[in-house]
């Protein structure tokens, strides 16, 4: 299990590197999807299954909007790929920065943290995840409404930007 969590952590870092060193919007969206799927898998391995599922569904919807927006506005006839030398050098510089940060963080002692997700007292075992479900639907109603309104507003902004010159969402390239 430890190897799996370390593998998910490395994939999350690679997804972040793919977003940071994206040569084209197509590849940036792939990096975002990779990072979100691996992050939700990481939460799932820690035992927070409901929050992981909710975040995965929200990220999947968000990535769909980002993908449509970036593909509609990308006008590169020959986009660069991840194998081009400029992109490889850019990604390698990010890896060096992450390694130096990891070494400095290891010397300072920034790795002393722990995550506990299951409380067990005797026979009873109450998962912290299910108390989060109750908080989502009781105290978080206002935040859900604000987040929903923000997503609807973002959808209208993206549709207006993609619309072009009064020709609707489909336009000739």
From Swiss-Prot:
Pfam families: Oxidored_q3
Protein EC: 7.1.1.2
Membrane spanning residue stretches: 1-21, 27-47, 48-68, 87-107, 139-159
Broad class of the protein's primary localization: mitochondrion
Molecular functions per Gene Ontology: NADH dehydrogenase (ubiquinone) activity
Subcellular location: Mitochondrion membrane
Gene Ontology terms: cellular component: mitochondrial membrane
UniProt KW keywords: Electron transport, Membrane, Mitochondrion, NAD, Respiratory chain, Translocase, Transmembrane, Transmembrane helix, Transport, Ubiquinone
Catalytic activity: a ubiquinone + NADH + 5 H(+)(in) = a ubiquinol + NAD(+) + 4 H(+)(out)
Assigned protein family: Belongs to the complex I subunit 6 family.
Function, as annotated: Core subunit of the mitochondrial membrane respiratory chain NADH dehydrogenase (Complex I) that is believed to belong to the minimal assembly required for catalysis. Complex I functions in the transfer of electrons from NADH to the respiratory chain. The immediate electron acceptor for the enzyme is believed to be ubiquinone.
UniProt-recorded name of the protein: NADH-ubiquinone oxidoreductase chain 6
